[in-house]
Amino acid sequence: MTPDIQAPFLSLLLLFPVLTVANVPTLTTSDSINPRRTTPVSTTQSSPTSSPTKETSWSTTTTLLTASSPAPSPAASPGHDGASTPTSSPAPSPAASPGHDGASTPTSSPAPSPAASPGHDGASTPTSSPAPSPAASPGHDGASTPTSSPAPSPAASPGHNGTSSPTGSPAPSPAASPGHDGASTPTSSPAPSPAASPGHNGTSSPTGSPAPSPAASPGHDGASTPTSSPAPSPAASPGHNGTSSPTGSPAPSPTASPGHDSAPSLTSSPAPSPTASPGQHGASSPTSSDTSSMTTRSMSSSMVTSAHKGTSSRATMTPVSKGTPSSVPSSETAPTAASHITRTAASSPSIALSTSSNPKTSQQLSVRVSLYFLSFRITNLQFNSSLENPQTSYYQELQRSIWGLILQIYKQRDFLGLSEIKFRPGSVVVELTLAFREGTTAEWVKAQFSQLEAHAASYNLTISGVSVYSAPFPSSAQAGSGVPGWGIALLVLVCVLVALAIIYLIALVVCQCGRKKCEQLDVFPTLDAYHPMSEYSTYHTHGRYVPPGSTKRSPYEEVSAGNGGSNLSYTNLAATSANL
């Protein structure tokens, strides 16, 4: 951590036991050069300067006004009851420290905008009272007086009994927070806008430098929300007790962080002069400003984040304490206060920034259409080949004539248009399709055309043979019913394959039947090749097979005796005798 960041935490840790102590008039500010050194500043109460302005009341809380000094803004120590007086140097806007009972006004250092710490009883929220002028808070005897030291601006801690009063710059009326005795007078130093943290009891009004808009810290319940009504007074967001008044510097639009209860919006209050609210001990008189009207930035420069209720606004103001004769001029202020003003609230009504947009959604009208086919003959013209080509001049001229004739005849609201103009031989036969709203009949279409045939003379057309009949409305299924060429070829191929398969099956059946027929012929042969087994001898020896009924003897049955010269034969009796 850098010394600039360590200084506020160190001061808070050292002064934590004093948080419960009230009415401590000292305010510790951190030096930009030596951040570890703190200088106590005693509170000074001076008589408030009252101005003869119209008395109006703003129910606001402690305002934190930033000035333009180069030193960073110190944080007021907690547990102090005093107001920190801003010096003449352009100090940045102070950041309110939590748990403090006092208001601190920022000095003239141009440091970046301070952010009030969350969880404090102070917030930069505009209140909803319609009074344009800022009012000192009632019942409090504390004011912030500017000192001449160039120290950085202290940050008012939330829940403090003091107010930081802006002095007379074109910023309209800053309002002191309620419950505080201080006057807030706007001055003309351009300091960057501080970002008030939600839940703080103080308002931080940014000065008129083109510093970026403050953003409310997330997780806090505080924001300054301007009202969209033409009333000058800003409307305080719920749970906040402070206002931040926007002025006419072209600063970028503030954006509230998401998840916060704050919404940034700008309103312009037409009331010129700030006045002290009744029941308060001090009045805030604007000094050294030519205009007291609050200027609003353009609506396009501000962005509203949803779920936020706080406004961040900048004003060209330097804090001036009660009783100071005049505001201290800042070295970085613009030469004229009017140069920072872009739009005065006195001459223009309040501008409310609205984020909700209701774009008109175009409804698609469904119209039921009736189509009619119209045909008629043009007898004074002759058909030729040029009427077959839409690119020829004769075709286009005749087409324009028919269009003009149809538009003159059917001028009613129900007529939607025509299409598909065709010509064919027979003198010239014109065929076209007319579109009408549903409810039109073919008889009415023919009657209208027949009654107004006189219009055809203006186009040098002689019409006869008018016929009208209802045409079917083309559906998407009918439009896409055409079969492509590849589909037809595929279909033919499938048919051929099926035919071949059928032929093959027929041939296969015929072959099977032929085979079965051949087997039957073999079973019943023409030759008698069957012999009963009973006709064969069971066995025989030394002989060969002799078929039954054969008278020829086997040569093996005859046995020669060899040397005896006698024939010896052996006969198998079993084969020759049936008695065996």
From Swiss-Prot:
Q: Which residues are glycosylated?
A: 73, 77, 84-85, 87-89, 161, 201, 241, 384, 460
Q: Which residues lie on this side of the membrane: Extracellular?
A: 23-489
State the UniProt keywords alphabetically: Autocatalytic cleavage, Cell membrane, Cytoplasm, Glycoprotein, Lipoprotein, Membrane, Nucleus, Palmitate, Phosphoprotein, Repeat, Signal, Transmembrane, Transmembrane helix
What residues bear Phosphothreonine in this entry? 551
Record Gene3D superfamilies? 6.10.140.600
The annotated region (Required for interaction with GSK3B) lies at 550-557
Low complexity composition bias: residue spans? 38-88, 96-108, 116-128, 136-148, 156-168, 176-188, 196-208, 216-228, 236-248, 256-306, 345-357
Which sequence positions carry the modification called Phosphoserine? 554
Q: Which named protein is this?
A: Mucin-1
